[in-house]
Amino acid sequence: AQDFERTKLTAVGTTPSDIPTSADFDSDDTIIGINMANRTANSITASCFMTSNQANDDIAFDFNITVTVAGGNFILDGQTKPALVLYRGFTYTFDVSSNTISSGSHVFAFATEADGANSSGYTTGVTATGTQGQANAKITLQVTDSTPETLYYYCTAHSGMGNTITSTNAHFIVKDAPIPAGSALQLLDGGAKMVVQNGDRMFFQSSTASSLD
Protein backbone atom coordinates (compact mmCIF):
# COMPACT_ATOMS: atom_id res chain seq x y z
CA ALA A 1 0.00 0.00 0.00
CA GLN A 2 1.14 3.53 -0.68
CA ASP A 3 2.01 5.68 2.30
CA PHE A 4 0.65 9.20 2.52
CA GLU A 5 1.93 12.09 4.56
CA ARG A 6 1.01 15.73 5.01
CA THR A 7 3.51 18.52 5.42
CA LYS A 8 2.48 22.02 6.48
CA LEU A 9 4.23 25.35 6.22
CA THR A 10 2.87 28.25 8.26
CA ALA A 11 3.26 32.01 7.81
CA VAL A 12 5.34 31.89 4.64
CA GLY A 13 6.46 35.30 3.44
CA THR A 14 8.77 36.91 0.93
CA THR A 15 11.68 34.59 1.79
CA PRO A 16 11.07 31.22 0.09
CA SER A 17 10.38 28.32 2.47
CA ASP A 18 11.05 24.74 1.47
CA ILE A 19 9.46 21.32 2.00
CA PRO A 20 11.01 19.21 3.48
CA THR A 21 12.42 21.96 5.69
CA SER A 22 16.14 22.50 5.05
CA ALA A 23 16.46 19.19 3.19
CA ASP A 24 16.11 17.55 -0.21
CA PHE A 25 13.49 14.94 -0.91
CA ASP A 26 15.33 11.75 -0.01
CA SER A 27 13.46 9.52 -2.46
CA ASP A 28 11.20 9.68 -5.49
CA ASP A 29 7.90 10.90 -4.05
CA THR A 30 4.44 11.46 -5.49
CA ILE A 31 2.74 14.76 -4.70
CA ILE A 32 -1.02 14.60 -5.11
CA GLY A 33 -2.08 17.98 -3.79
CA ILE A 34 -0.77 21.44 -2.94
CA ASN A 35 -2.90 23.90 -0.97
CA MET A 36 -1.79 27.53 -0.73
CA ALA A 37 -4.01 29.52 1.64
CA ASN A 38 -4.05 33.27 2.19
CA ARG A 39 -4.09 33.81 5.95
CA THR A 40 -4.53 37.60 5.75
CA ALA A 41 -7.35 40.08 5.15
CA ASN A 42 -5.70 41.32 1.95
CA SER A 43 -5.11 39.88 -1.50
CA ILE A 44 -1.65 38.37 -2.04
CA THR A 45 0.28 36.66 -4.80
CA ALA A 46 1.99 33.34 -4.21
CA SER A 47 4.51 31.14 -5.99
CA CYS A 48 5.60 27.53 -5.81
CA PHE A 49 8.80 26.41 -7.51
CA MET A 50 11.20 23.50 -7.68
CA THR A 51 14.97 23.35 -7.78
CA SER A 52 16.36 20.30 -9.51
CA ASN A 53 18.84 17.76 -8.20
CA GLN A 54 22.31 18.94 -9.19
CA ALA A 55 25.79 19.20 -7.79
CA ASN A 56 26.07 21.38 -4.68
CA ASP A 57 22.35 22.18 -4.58
CA ASP A 58 22.63 22.00 -0.79
CA ILE A 59 24.79 25.11 -0.89
CA ALA A 60 22.74 28.32 -0.87
CA PHE A 61 19.44 26.40 -0.73
CA ASP A 62 18.24 28.88 1.90
CA PHE A 63 19.68 31.84 -0.07
CA ASN A 64 22.37 32.36 2.56
CA ILE A 65 26.01 31.30 2.19
CA THR A 66 28.64 31.37 4.93
CA VAL A 67 32.10 32.22 3.61
CA THR A 68 35.32 31.28 5.40
CA VAL A 69 38.91 30.60 4.31
CA ALA A 70 41.05 27.50 4.84
CA GLY A 71 44.04 26.10 3.00
CA GLY A 72 44.18 29.05 0.65
CA ASN A 73 40.62 28.48 -0.59
CA PHE A 74 37.23 29.99 0.02
CA ILE A 75 35.00 27.61 1.98
CA LEU A 76 31.29 28.05 1.23
CA ASP A 77 28.85 26.41 3.62
CA GLY A 78 31.58 23.99 4.64
CA GLN A 79 32.63 22.96 1.13
CA THR A 80 35.96 23.85 -0.45
CA LYS A 81 35.53 26.36 -3.31
CA PRO A 82 32.47 24.62 -4.80
CA ALA A 83 30.86 25.57 -8.07
CA LEU A 84 27.60 27.37 -7.25
CA VAL A 85 24.20 27.22 -8.91
CA LEU A 86 22.03 30.26 -8.16
CA TYR A 87 18.49 30.94 -9.34
CA ARG A 88 17.31 34.03 -11.18
CA GLY A 89 14.79 36.17 -9.38
CA PHE A 90 16.33 35.72 -5.94
CA THR A 91 18.82 37.57 -3.75
CA TYR A 92 21.63 35.64 -2.08
CA THR A 93 23.44 36.77 1.05
CA PHE A 94 27.10 35.88 1.55
CA ASP A 95 28.20 36.11 5.19
CA VAL A 96 31.79 37.38 5.03
CA SER A 97 32.21 38.14 8.74
CA SER A 98 34.67 35.32 9.51
CA ASN A 99 38.06 36.45 10.81
CA THR A 100 39.62 33.80 8.57
CA ILE A 101 38.97 36.29 5.77
CA SER A 102 40.61 39.31 7.38
CA SER A 103 43.49 37.37 8.95
CA GLY A 104 44.74 36.40 5.50
CA SER A 105 44.00 39.78 3.92
CA HIS A 106 41.44 38.13 1.64
CA VAL A 107 38.64 39.99 -0.13
CA PHE A 108 35.64 38.07 -1.48
CA ALA A 109 34.28 39.44 -4.76
CA PHE A 110 32.54 38.57 -8.03
CA ALA A 111 33.76 38.81 -11.63
CA THR A 112 32.88 37.81 -15.17
CA GLU A 113 36.27 36.14 -15.64
CA ALA A 114 38.15 33.74 -13.37
CA ASP A 115 40.14 35.50 -10.64
CA GLY A 116 38.84 38.84 -11.90
CA ALA A 117 41.16 38.81 -14.89
CA ASN A 118 41.15 41.77 -17.29
CA SER A 119 39.45 44.09 -14.79
CA SER A 120 36.29 41.98 -15.00
CA GLY A 121 34.95 42.67 -11.51
CA TYR A 122 31.16 42.37 -11.36
CA THR A 123 29.15 44.78 -9.21
CA THR A 124 25.68 44.86 -10.78
CA GLY A 125 23.13 43.91 -8.13
CA VAL A 126 25.92 43.54 -5.55
CA THR A 127 25.64 45.31 -2.19
CA ALA A 128 28.33 45.15 0.50
CA THR A 129 27.62 45.86 4.17
CA GLY A 130 30.34 46.26 6.79
CA THR A 131 34.01 45.31 6.57
CA GLN A 132 34.90 41.78 5.48
CA GLY A 133 36.28 39.74 8.36
CA GLN A 134 34.36 41.73 10.96
CA ALA A 135 31.02 41.11 12.68
CA ASN A 136 27.88 41.42 10.55
CA ALA A 137 29.76 41.89 7.29
CA LYS A 138 27.85 40.58 4.30
CA ILE A 139 27.55 40.82 0.54
CA THR A 140 24.24 40.39 -1.26
CA LEU A 141 23.97 39.34 -4.89
CA GLN A 142 20.70 39.89 -6.72
CA VAL A 143 20.39 37.32 -9.50
CA THR A 144 18.16 38.61 -12.31
CA ASP A 145 17.39 37.85 -15.95
CA SER A 146 20.28 40.13 -16.92
CA THR A 147 22.83 38.44 -14.65
CA PRO A 148 25.44 36.65 -16.80
CA GLU A 149 24.92 32.91 -17.03
CA THR A 150 28.45 32.41 -15.72
CA LEU A 151 30.10 34.47 -12.99
CA TYR A 152 33.04 33.76 -10.72
CA TYR A 153 33.65 34.34 -7.05
CA TYR A 154 37.27 35.05 -6.24
CA CYS A 155 39.74 36.76 -3.94
CA THR A 156 40.93 40.15 -5.15
CA ALA A 157 44.31 39.58 -3.49
CA HIS A 158 45.08 35.92 -4.26
CA SER A 159 44.46 33.66 -7.24
CA GLY A 160 42.86 30.23 -7.29
CA MET A 161 40.61 30.64 -4.25
CA GLY A 162 37.20 30.59 -5.94
CA ASN A 163 35.10 28.93 -8.60
CA THR A 164 32.18 29.42 -10.98
CA ILE A 165 28.65 30.67 -10.35
CA THR A 166 26.00 29.49 -12.79
CA SER A 167 22.78 31.50 -13.00
CA THR A 168 19.75 29.46 -14.03
CA ASN A 169 15.97 29.47 -13.82
CA ALA A 170 13.93 27.82 -11.10
CA HIS A 171 11.11 25.55 -12.27
CA PHE A 172 7.87 27.29 -11.30
CA ILE A 173 4.73 25.25 -10.77
CA VAL A 174 2.85 28.52 -10.32
CA LYS A 175 4.27 32.04 -10.22
CA ASP A 176 2.73 35.18 -8.72
CA ALA A 177 -0.74 33.64 -8.63
CA PRO A 178 -3.33 35.97 -7.05
CA ILE A 179 -5.09 34.64 -3.95
CA PRO A 180 -7.91 36.82 -2.56
CA ALA A 181 -8.28 37.43 1.16
CA GLY A 182 -9.46 34.35 3.00
CA SER A 183 -9.14 32.14 -0.08
CA ALA A 184 -6.81 29.33 -1.12
CA LEU A 185 -5.26 28.08 -4.34
CA GLN A 186 -5.28 24.32 -4.79
CA LEU A 187 -2.97 22.60 -7.26
CA LEU A 188 -2.91 19.03 -8.57
CA ASP A 189 -6.37 18.16 -7.22
CA GLY A 190 -8.75 16.00 -9.24
CA GLY A 191 -6.45 13.02 -9.73
CA ALA A 192 -3.44 14.91 -11.08
CA LYS A 193 -0.09 14.16 -9.49
CA MET A 194 3.57 15.07 -9.74
CA VAL A 195 6.57 12.86 -9.09
CA VAL A 196 9.61 14.56 -7.59
CA GLN A 197 13.05 13.02 -7.64
CA ASN A 198 15.60 12.36 -4.95
CA GLY A 199 17.40 15.62 -4.24
CA ASP A 200 14.67 17.97 -5.49
CA ARG A 201 13.45 20.85 -3.35
CA MET A 202 10.04 22.51 -3.36
CA PHE A 203 9.72 26.15 -2.29
CA PHE A 204 6.80 28.43 -1.48
CA GLN A 205 6.85 32.22 -1.44
CA SER A 206 4.35 35.02 -0.84
CA SER A 207 4.26 38.66 -1.85
CA THR A 208 3.93 39.81 1.77
CA ALA A 209 5.31 38.76 5.13
CA SER A 210 3.75 35.85 7.04
CA SER A 211 0.75 35.66 4.71
CA LEU A 212 0.72 32.15 3.23
CA ASP A 213 -0.16 28.80 4.83
Show which residues each predicted segment covers.
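Asparagine-centered strand-capping/turn motif at beta-strand->loop junctions
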Residues: 21-24, 35-42, 143, 204-206
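C-terminal interaction-tip segments
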Residues: 1-29, 46-48, 197-199, 205-213
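Short solvent-exposed strand-capping/beta-turn motif centered on an Asx-Ser/Thr pair
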Residues: 36-41, 89, 97-101, 207-209
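Extended extracellular/luminal ectodomain segments enriched in beta-structured repeat modules
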Residues: 24-32, 87-93
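Noncatalytic modules at the cell exterior or secretory-pathway interfaces
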Residues: 32-33, 147-153, 193-208
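Extracytoplasmic copper-binding redox domains, predominantly the cupredoxin/blue-copper superfamily
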Residues: 57-170
